[in-house]
Amino acid sequence: MSLGNHIRVFLCVVFMGVLVGYVYNAKKDITDHDYIDIVKEGYLENFSDVTVRNAFNYAFFEPYWRYYQAKTKEQVVELSGDITFQGEKGHAILQFVVDEQTKQFSLRAMKFNEVVLNAEQKQKLVGMVYHTWEMKQLAYE
């Protein structure tokens, strides 16, 4: 094997190592972040008796949490999962925005089956999630 081939093989190995490292670290950063913990352990306004994590884990099938920084530089925690809403089974996506200074968060956007929900629909979905949690708590008593 010539020196040129050795260099090409070496560069390919280095490139693959960098690529694997990037993919591994990017996945870890997205699903394991302090802002995700802030939202999971926090409470939504008007629902101070149960954490966001507990309420949504009861209502969502296989909830998936991830973090990213939006193009607007906002810190976004996104929760997605399957849920039945208004008699229809589907996939919901909720986006919480975390304030970097105060570490407070708010629910900003929500989709159900790729349709953006308006304020009234968001309230209904969140209310249904917390109602589901309450009903399951009563069932365990």
Report each predicted region and the residues it spans.
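Sec-dependent N-terminal signal peptides
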Residues: R8-V14
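Cystatin/cathelin-like cysteine-protease inhibitor module
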Residues: L3-R8, L19-E141
